[in-house]
Amino acid sequence: MFVLSLAAMAQNKPRHATLSQQKMCADQAKKSFEEDNIKPEHALTWQFSSHYETNTNICYVMTWISTMDNSNKFTLSHYVYDAFEGREYASFIEIGSDVVECSVAPTPEENIKCKTDDDFLRLVYKQYGVAK
């Protein structure tokens, strides 16, 4: 009975990524970010972060790129995608003060709409564990 209790507890305990999984994810995230995101001419921010999710075996990458063009128009974009397969899970685009896209799609059938950068970042952290 004690063994069954330990087994049940182990199933409910979240697994953490090993150092090798984290490194594999970080390396692939860097590679995919640099290959898929040409640095804009007027980039203010051109960065990414990654998170390896052990339950799904997915390496999530979140990019954040901000630019200011010659007319002082500010653009901010974030994307969350799988570093290995390229599937996009979330996107946010703000041009000037207008949010033109803000969606988080945990599954192909589900699409959560959001309204602000803060909403997007909160949802992305909750759904995928990846943060700025």
Where are these regions (language model features)?
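Bacterial N-terminal signal peptides
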Residues: M1-S5
